[in-house]
Swiss-Prot record:
Higher taxonomy: Bacteria, Pseudomonadati, Pseudomonadota, Betaproteobacteria, Burkholderiales
Encoding gene per record: dsdA
Organism expressing this protein natively: Burkholderia pseudomallei (strain 668)
Molecular function as annotated in GO: D-serine ammonia-lyase activity; hydro-lyase activity; pyridoxal phosphate binding
Record's keyword terms, sorted: Lyase, Pyridoxal phosphate
Entry similarity comment: Belongs to the serine/threonine dehydratase family. DsdA subfamily.
Broadest EC class assigned to this enzyme: lyase
Pfam short name (any one): PALP
Domain of life: Bacteria
Protein name: Probable D-serine dehydratase
Catalytic activity: D-serine = pyruvate + NH4(+)
Length: 445
């Protein structure tokens, strides 16, 4: 049987994916009922409340967070220069912004939102169970000697391509937990080194992300007092990401950008296993409903969420199943199989997905540097082509027409997911590579 035949994928879509051709796919399932296990409004409120009550603790642990009072928040930067530079005039409709999660302190990526939330939830649970904190206790008590001694009896473990490991590792080790990060072959050396300088145990694997996660899960299962952060199915991670929605809503209101039937919001999010974009989309849908249109961006070598959403919902699918190799410079997005939790929710809520090849990643990375003064890692630039796909492609224009959307009234938010902690020499290497490829023929559409 030919590769991909049994996945219930449209043959034309399958051919596009197998050819590594950048593709926009529109989700026909958008608007279907949410699964029964979907988080509730109370779950979202609890996550937001947790991050707020722990803000003082975070400010005490990390000097970088004192300016924000310990809140995990990033700027919303206008992207008018990027819009003006769009190659096709028809891609310039609406107002463009970049959500700067690349600038999140301490962890330097979007993973701070989910990772910090899960570690804080664990720390609160242990402290309350052992009488070290109550419902009204100042959470700075979790940095006390007694709390650290208790946490030292516990291990926090995670599997990661890099950024989630940084997020979990930085906070868990700061609180006194023994911390172990299983890292895939895609993980960058500087991320491993940064963790080790914080006393985190890094276990390196020759395999991909899924193998690193599975190794961590199996090791954790045999250890007492060990909490495994499961990027493929964690509700705590998912809810932490969802808290970004209220932050973005406040920033859009401050910028004078309403979100309603006449003024739709388009959000473009880099996507690996799906948890971070899934959580953010879930939070935004809770606020704006049908007026938010979310598109996830994946490497052409690793479109695991697109494959899962476009295929049979009942069976987990991998990019390997359609003959792709999951090899990309976007190390943070090098994931072969989607999170079942995130995929089930994105199936009901995402407007679609688009793919980006490595040449485009580096072109977008260079645009971010030259037009906006932002230094990104390659995976963080994956979504920069989103507005052009919507306004400049046949499928994108059909999506707008089908919903009666005036493209000039839309707001586009491009999520930049990581880069501020990348060493300067790495940024220079990224940008030199991008300039070299531009000189020999550009990056394509």
């Amino acid at each position: 049987m030919p590769v991909g035949r049994s996945l219930s994928l449209d043959p034309n879509l399958l051919a596009q994916l197998q050819s590594h051709s950048p593709t926009l796919w529109l989700n026909p399932h958008q608007g279907m009922p949410l699964p029964d296990f979907a988080p509730t409004a109370a779950d979202l409120a609890d996550a937001d409340a947790r991050l707020r009550r722990c803000a003082g603790l975070l400010a005490e642990l990390f000097a970088e967070l004192r300016l924000s009072g310990g809140l995990i928040a990033s700027p919303l930067q206008p992207a008018e220069p990027l819009k003006r530079a769009a190659r096709a005039g028809h891609a310039q409709a609406g107002a463009w912004y970049v959500k700067r999660d690349d600038a999140l302190p301490v962890a330097g990526s979007i993973k701070a939102r989910g990772g910090f939330h899960e570690v804080l939830a664990l720390a609160e649970s242990i402290a309350e169970r052992h009488g070290l904190a109550g419902a009204d206790t100042d959470r700075r008590a979790l940095a006390s000697g007694a709390a650290r001694a208790r946490f030292a009896r516990h291990t926090v473990m995670v599997g990661s391509t890099g950024n989630l490991g940084l997020s979990i590792g930085m906070l868990a080790s700061a609180l006194g937990f023994r911390t172990v990060v299983h890292m895939s072959a895609d993980a960058k050396a500087w991320k491993k080194a940064r963790l080790r300088t914080r006393g985190v145990e890094v276990v390196e694997h020759a395999g991909d992300y899924a193998k690193a996660v599975d190794a961590g899960r199996r090791q954790a299962a045999g250890m007492p007092c060990c909490h495994f952060v499961d990027d493929e199915g964690s509700r705590m991670l998912f809810l932490g990401y969802a808290t970004a929605a209220a932050e973005l809503a406040a920033q859009l209101a401050q910028a004078g950008r309403p979100v309603d039937a006449r003024h739709p919001l388009f959000v473009h999010l880099p996507c690996g296993v799906g948890g971070a974009p899934g959580g953010i989309v879930y939070g935004l849908k809770a606020l704006y409903g049908e007026h938010v249109h979310a598109f996830v961006a994946e490497p052409t070598a690793s479109p695991c969420v697109l494959v899962q959403l476009a295929g049979d919902a009942a069976h987990p699918r991998s990019v390997y199943d359609i003959g792709l190799d999951n090899r990309t410079e976007a190390d943070g997005l090098a994931v072969a199989q989607a999170s079942p939790l995130a995929a089930a929710l994105l199936r009901a809520q995402a407007a679609g997905a688009f793919t980006v090849d490595d040449r485009q990643l580096f072109a977008h990375l260079l645009d971010a540097r030259e037009r906006l003064g932002i230094d990104l890692e390659p995976s963080a630039a994956a979504a920069f082509g989103g507005p052009a796909w919507i306004a400049g492609s046949d499928a994108g224009r059909a999506y707008l027409r089908g919903r009666g959307i005036d493209p000039d009234a839309a707001t586009h938010v491009i999520w930049a997911t990581g880069g501020s902690l990348v060493p300067a020499q790495e940024h220079r290497r990224f940008q030199a590579h991008a300039r070299a490829q531009r000189q020999v023929g550009g990056a394509g559409a």
